[in-house]
Amino acid sequence: MQIETLTVEPLTKEAFAPFGDVIEVEGAQLRLINNGTTERYHDLARVEAAGTQTRVLINIFRGQSFAAPIDIMMMERHPFGSQAFIPLNGRPFLVVVAEDAGAGPARPRAFLARGDQGVNYLRNIWHHPLLALEQKSDFLVVDRAGREDNLEEYFFSDYAYRIETTQTA
């Protein structure tokens, strides 16, 4: 099996734009609400929920922690809805995404999300399942429910991608 190394990039809105949204207050539109006692950071992600008998779900995922090296052997995508991950414990996590190459994902990219950043994967974006770092971590997950199967998985057969370090280049 051939193994290619992925370099971890810092998570920025610009770099992540082809895959979805970075959820953070930095640069967000601020509105004061509740008689000025609450700051609302408005419209941070594009939530998508298509299909039949569709609704938006709010879940908590508890992710086991990973340490480098991490081998990326598979990816998944959701054809009918976006999926957002917002860390609840303030810990960093890895985000691995790829554009579609027709018969599966293209070469993945890896991003390091800070503990105050979340991500929203748009519909049909290939991504690796949750990669919490440091210790077991909880994430608020905004997801889609509906009649259609909203999960496609792809397993790399002849190669894998390896993250040698969780630090950014």
From Swiss-Prot:
Its cofactor is Ni(2+). GO terms for biological process: allantoin catabolic process; purine nucleobase catabolic process. Its EC number is 4.3.2.3. It comes from the Bacteria. Pathway: Nitrogen metabolism; (S)-allantoin degradation. It catalyses: (S)-ureidoglycolate = urea + glyoxylate. InterPro entries: RmlC_Cupin_sf, UAH_cupin, Ureidogly_lyase, Ureidogly_lyase_bac, Ureidoglycolate_lyase_dom_sf. GO terms for molecular function: ureidoglycolate hydrolase activity; ureidoglycolate lyase activity. Keywords: Lyase, Purine metabolism. Catalyzes the catabolism of the allantoin degradation intermediate (S)-ureidoglycolate, generating urea and glyoxylate. Involved in the utilization of allantoin as nitrogen source. Homodimer. NCBIfam families: PRK03606.2-4, PRK13395.1. Belongs to the ureidoglycolate lyase family. This is Ureidoglycolate lyase. The gene is allA.
